[in-house]
Amino acid sequence: MTTTADPSSAQVEIASAQGVDYTLYDDVLSTYVDDSGWVNYADLQQSRQALDTFNNGLATVDDATLSSWSEEEQIAFWINAYNSLTLKSIVDQTPLKPSIKDITGVWRLRKHPINEKEKTLNNIEHDVLRVDFDEPRLHAAIVCAAISCPPLRNDAFTGENLDAQLDEQVEQWLARPDGLKIDKAAGEVKVSKIFSWFGGDWIPSYGVDSGFTGSKEEQAVLNFISQYVSDEDRAYLEAGDYQVSYFDYDWTLNNQQ
């Protein structure tokens, strides 16, 4: 059985020339997401009006308003939209699915009203965020509702705080058991599978001609990661005397236990 948003949910204007009012979305995150990024989907499913009202408001953001914002504000908008619509996709299912991958067409087929258009989650990630902005840290911020995803923040991204928030996200992501492991004794550096899937996104800003190891994509990823580790680990990564491998990806729902 699939549940949908209450059709009586109000469609509110959430945006202005100054940016987006994230009050409703902040309330959702602070209430149902813990400090480790796990989500209480069962409770959210029972009290989803704020989430639905915010998501309905995404449809009212027009191109003129969106284009008037700073790049940081635009990135924050699209990241928040991706994450809030992912939450919707999960709680639309009754009973809750064990994994987002159990929801047919969740990324490619299910369309959501946003920016006076209809977009899938794949459209937001691959046709907007990854195309319009040179910001590979977005991969630490968009959360696909799986255990191996980066942690979901329990506050909204904002244009004003985006740079610091993205750095925090990277640090928390790499600190996870399947984010980064540097094993000097074994000569192995193991990183999230996300870096394998989207390694090319790091080349424009972090590509290098020497140092590190592996393919051009892996060198760029390792250069990026080196900005977030100790000086000792940075020197080890730059030396390149190790093998790169990737953690298996756990698609189990990032549900609070």
Annotate each predicted stretch with a short phrase.
Residues 2-79, 83-257:
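Interaction/scaffold regions that mediate signaling and macromolecular assembly across diverse proteins
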